[in-house]
Amino acid sequence: MSEAYVETIGGETVLRRTPASDHERLVESLHALVRAALPFNSTLQLLPPRSPLRLADDCVLCPDLAVVRANPEGVSSPHLVAEVLLPGDHHLDTFIKKQIWSDLRLPRLWMVDPRYLNIEVYGCNEFGFTLQDILANHHPLTDPHLPGLSCSMEEFFKPVRRG
């Protein structure tokens, strides 16, 4: 079981509560899917769950999943971030952090919502984030930079589905 963790937003410390076991199962599944789909010689690197990403002096975020692109200068830039929403604690992820990622021109954001058994896929353009898809039921989770990634929402949410 994971522990509570801290993020810094606008210089303010934000204590995030301990994720539930269903949340952690989804995070583990995401990591396994992405790890298996990353090309062998890719410049993309999957970080451990909730690795702190210092985005500015006053901003450190700890996404559930982060894939960074390494560049020759040794600086890594976020390429894909996924947040698994916690019931009762999703405002920070769905509004505040999503705006931060949009302002930083993050190429891809996945918002995983276990309440509705779907994933919202955002991409960035010149105006910020655009909702590109809402994946549910038999729709597969795919990504152009992860050629081997394909998992239906039905299969992905199976470990937490009730009934």
Question: Each predicted region: which residue ranges?
Answer:
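Gly/Pro/Ser/Thr-rich low-complexity, intrinsically disordered segments predominantly at protein N-termini
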Residues: 1-163
